[in-house]
From Swiss-Prot:
Gene Ontology terms: biological process: translation
CC per GO annotation: cytoplasm; ribonucleoprotein complex; ribosome
Designated name of the protein: Large ribosomal subunit protein bL36
Annotated keywords: Ribonucleoprotein, Ribosomal protein
InterPro entries hit by this protein: Ribosomal_bL36, Ribosomal_bL36_sp
Top-level division of the source organism's lineage: Bacteria
Species, as recorded: Staphylococcus carnosus (strain TM300)
Length: 37
């Protein structure tokens, strides 16, 4: 999980979702997981 000020989809499988008011990216590739901090 990467915590970044700006999250962007890295590949086509990356999905942007919102959980508890935080923007997150979920993907099949675990390296692509990101969350806005």
């Amino acid at each position: 999980m990467k915590v970044r000020p700006s999250v962007k989809p890295i590949c086509e499988k990356c999905k942007v979702i919102k959980r508890k008011g935080k923007v997150m990216i979920i993907c099949e590739n675990p390296k692509h997981k990101q969350r806005q901090g």
